[in-house]
Amino acid sequence: MDSFQQLQLRMKDCQKCLDEGFDIVPGAIFSGPQSARAMIIGQAPGVTEVEAKRPFNAGSGKRLFDWLNRAGWEESDFRQNQYMTSVTKCYPGKDRSGKGDRVPSKQEQLICRPYLQQEFRIVDAVLIMPVGKLAIAQFFREFKRLSDLIGQAAYIPWEHRSHELPIVVKKSELTDAFTRKESLGGSWVVPLPHPSGASLWPNKPENKMLIDRAINIIGDIRSAYDL
């Protein structure tokens, strides 16, 4: 059994958050092969993801795959050939109101971080798309507003994969255009807002323009690397 398979088994069997008293539904949700060249990192699975046993299964998945389709990917192709995971791996349960899903605590994020770190190192993705603030913070911790990040990309050299998450990307490292860096080796990180229907951010005209720019960058990277 190789290291990737061992990692998957450890994630599926993990009950560390449950042991710490968090009312999660154990059973990590992720998908995709080790050979994936693109990776999506979400916040955490929702209840429909648990039922379907696949990431981004509900309405948020529809919007996300609408964006990816505009960048050149069919949903079935992406799900089969690319990698999808999240900051925390298990469904965190409902929030106090009972209407929405609970945002994973900082402690839960720390518990799960070694898994994400290993995924980041093992899956040799040339394109990483953190989706939503929790995932974006794994790379862009110094940025507080989505409008300062969406529509931008950052190139992370390969040696940064040995660094502990979060990786701190500086403002000077951001670009709003893709230029292939074949000789360097590494990953392009293109953040996306959370595609949940409950989020109003993607619906604002000025933000739609930023999303369009992000989709164009993703499409350029997909084409350049034949993803």
Where are the language model's segments positioned?
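A polyanion-binding, active-site-adjacent surface
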Residues: 1-227
